[in-house]
Amino acid sequence: MSVSYEDVVNAYALIQNHIINTESYYSNVLSEILGSKIIVKYENKQHTGSFKVRGALNKLLSLSKAEKQNGIIAMSAGNHSQGVAYSAKILGIKSTIVMPDNTPFDKIRKTSDLGADVIIHGETLNDAEKHVDSLVKKNNFTKIHPFNDKFIIAGQGTMALEFIEDHPDIDTLLVPVGGGGLIAGCSLIAKHLNKKIEVIGVETELFPSLYNVYNNTNFICGGSTLAEGIAVSNIGKIPLSIIKKNVKEVLKVSENSIEEAVSIFLLKDKVVSEGAGAAGLAAILENKDKFKNRNVGIFLCGGNIDSRVLSSILMRDLVRKGQIITLSIAMADKPGQLGAISKLCAEERVNILGVEHSRFALDLSVSSARLEITLETRNNEHAKNIIKKIELLGFSVIVKNTK
C-alpha cells in the first residue's frame, strides 16, 4: 500500500481548515551556535502541541459513516493519543485510547481532557496494541495505527509540504524517527519538490530500529529515554518501503545530546521542545562538521514535555555549566569551621542553596566532620575559584556532581 505525492496534497486539502500552518523561520541564534543555517518548523505550536493531529485528522476524515458511528481506538504513549482524541472530538467521533503504564501523567490527563476514554494497560506499547486488537474485535472499533497507515503517512507529510514551500533553499532535512510515519511522508514530499534535498533520519541511540536496517546492525532497542515519542522498536512496513526510496542515511544520537538540545531550544531559542522534538537539533550538535554551511531544516515536531522533566533538564544544565555545584568538605569537628566557609562564600558572591553537616558517619574519625554544601556560582571558572579558595583555608574538597 503505497503513498503518493497526490495523496499528501489531497490530505492537505482535507485538513488545512482544521490545522495551524505553523510558523517556520531561520534561527539566527541556533545557526550561530552550530555553524549551519538552521531553519526550524515550530510544530510544537500545532493543535495538541505536536504534528500528530495532521495524520489523525486525515485518517478520521477517510472513514466511512459506519466506521465513524462505531467509534475509533488507538494505542499510544505519546502525542498520537492527543492527536486522535482531538481529531475525534472536532469530528464528533467517539474515541478510546489505550496507553501503557509508563505513559507520563500529563499526557494521560490531556488525552482524557480531549474527551477520549482512556484505558491504562500493559507495560509496553506492544502490550497496549494487543489490548486494542481485542477491543476492536469485541466492539467493532476502527483501529487508528500511529504510523503503519497510508492516510496517517500522507497527513504527516503535509508538514514538509508547508515547510519546503516556505523555504525552498533547504538542502538537508533532519527528521525524527519513531515508527517511520513522519519521515516517510516528509521524505516523499521533499524528494518530489527537490530531488537534491538530503533527507536524514534521527533516532535515539536507545531505539535505533531504522539505523539497524540501514547499517545492517543489531543494536537492541530498549531503555528509559527522554525521547519517548520516538521510542519504537520496529519500523512499520508501509513507511519503510517509502523511506528506503527517499532517505539517504540514519543517525543515532545520545540521550545527553537530546537533553542538551531541549535545553538549547528553551534557553537560546525561547521555545519548549519535548525530547523527540529536539532530535534533529541533537544530530547537529553531534555532527557539527557534517552540517557546517548547509541549509538544514529541522522539525521541532512536539512540545509536550512533563514539567518535572523540564525542570530537571534545566537544573542539570546548570550543573554542567558549573553554576550549581555540590561539595563534600572534610574538616575538624570544632567551632568556626562552617562559619569560615560561609564567610568565604559571602565574599565571593556565592549563594548557598543547601547544607548538610555530618559528625557521625563511620568513615570519619571521631574528631572529624563532613560538610556537604550546594552552591550557586556564575560559571565553571567561578566554581573552580571558590573550590581553590576553600582548599587554601585548609579543607579537603571533593566535587560531588560532575559531568
Regions found by a protein language model. Name each.
Residues 1-403:
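PLP-dependent amino-acid enzyme catalytic core
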